[in-house]
Amino acid sequence: MHPGRTTGKGPSTHTQIDQQPPRLLIVHIALPSWADICTNLCEALQNFFSLACSLMGPSRMSLFSLYMVQDQHECILPFVQVKGNFARLQTCISELRMLQREGCFRSQGASLRLAVEDGLQQFKQYSRHVTTRAALTYTSLEITILTSQPGKEVVKQLEEGLKDTDLARVRRFQVVEVTKGILEHVDSASPVEDTSNDESSILGTDIDLQTIDNDIVSMEIFFKAWLHNSGTDQEQIHLLLSSQCFSNISRPRDNPMCLKCDLQERLLCPSLLAGTADGSLRMDDPKGDFITLYQMASQSSASHYKLQVIKALKSSGLCESLTYGLPFILRPTSCWQLDWDELETNQQHFHALCHSLLKREWLLLAKGEPPGPGHSQRIPASTFYVIMPSHSLTLLVKAVATRELMLPSTFPLLPEDPHDDSLKNVESMLDSLELEPTYNPLHVQSHLYSHLSSIYAKPQGRLHPHWESRAPRKHPCKTGQLQTNRARATVAPLPMTPVPGRASKMPAASKSSSDAFFLPSEWEKDPSRP
């Protein structure tokens, strides 16, 4: 299903998942650290983009650009559309693999600042171009700097170097320090964010400092966070609790408690990826997995998708065979439009609900209520969900079957005493199995990355008429070393109107990359257009 496609007589709506910000990744890793990090980083990037480029449905990422900073800054990839561009991204990842891993040179302190300024200038020119030519708007940019240097030192360097730079269009600024630690707890391999965050008011924006381990899984997980719907313009779900549900929460009987929540995916829908076991069954079905609670909750609307709790259930009273579809995670909202007191109260109530459900060993049965009535006079079918507590500040939401969906089934009771010989044989086989206390999906590989890469990769070579070869840069300590030519991602300059007073301020080293862009796909298809 594509953005804007309708599934009924109502108007099409674009979801917030379409509005993910463009991203600029700056790899700031000097020698000799690059030799240790290069392989893991390139593998993680290739795995990530094999997913991001091939996911059906609304685009999870809009634009992406890649810079490398060692002795100088270099634009490896100007801003390009991510979806459907795996071959181009794969070629640029190959560029990273080919960069020099040995030798010595002195890192230039201004190179990182120049990379940020050059990327910002590219983004401004690109957004100006697509706004006038394609009626698209890219209003803000997320910048991520992946560094092998001490993160706090890099933050201070950026604060000092960028204090005169206009960062008004930077939505988020991250510095991610790659550490040499080994992944100890793979099942919870999430980036660690430094919450101390020294004052970054010099720039008028905060710089988030995080650390990740130098291994493929940790880097993969960091990049996959880019696929989440990170919008905070409004809450996505209203969870409505009547006063009869929990007597320990005092509310008037005629005024149900409303918990404002954000919705987060737990995993990617397999039917949105080519080559998965069930991918061919529902990918084109307008009533398939893509029309889910997540999409309905993400619709930009004055009203919100509501989950009306109608009763409680014992945790032991739900058969897993009655749940279906993808699970989702509910969190207390972080919507910036709510005042601080309301956010705090909402989180406290959410915490109390999680605690009470765990203590009572209860689940909640809720009925989904769409944001508003459709144009049809027909009574819409309702969807019901079970809401399960956890030991974190989250709730798990799963769709549950109703009477209309049930098929007749018989389940004979299990006899108490199985046959002795059969019991011994089966127990002997079970004893030979390795027993794990928990299931860790990060330890189980389906070879999906390599499968997707083989589908969407193209033969190396001239992928685009504007691609051309360029002499490689020279390193001070490697002037006598024979280097091979590498393909660079360059295109014809976009027709731009120069901004008065800005041309003289552009660094000479970054001028070429600021003037070169990949055009959006619709412009590539029709080169005759102006």
Curated annotation (Swiss-Prot):
InterPro entries: M1AP
Keywords: Cytoplasm, Differentiation, Disease variant, Spermatogenesis
PANTHER family: MEIOSIS 1 ARREST PROTEIN
UniProt-listed GO biological process terms: cell differentiation; chromatin organization; female gamete generation; male meiosis chromosome separation; meiosis I; RNA processing; spermatogenesis
Protein name, as recorded: Meiosis 1 arrest protein
Record note on what altering R266Q does: In SPGF48; uncertain significance
Disease: Spermatogenic failure 48: An autosomal recessive infertility disorder caused by spermatogenesis defects resulting in non-obstructive azoospermia.
A molecular-function term among this protein's GO annotations: identical protein binding
Gene: M1AP
One Gene Ontology cellular component annotation held by this UniProt entry: membrane
Spans through the membrane: none
Region described as Disordered: 463-530
Functional note: Required for meiosis I progression during spermatogenesis.
Species assigned in the record: Homo sapiens
Highest taxon in the source lineage: Eukaryota
Effect of S50P: In SPGF48; uncertain significance
Compartments in which it is found: Cytoplasm
Comp. bias intervals (Low complexity): 503-516
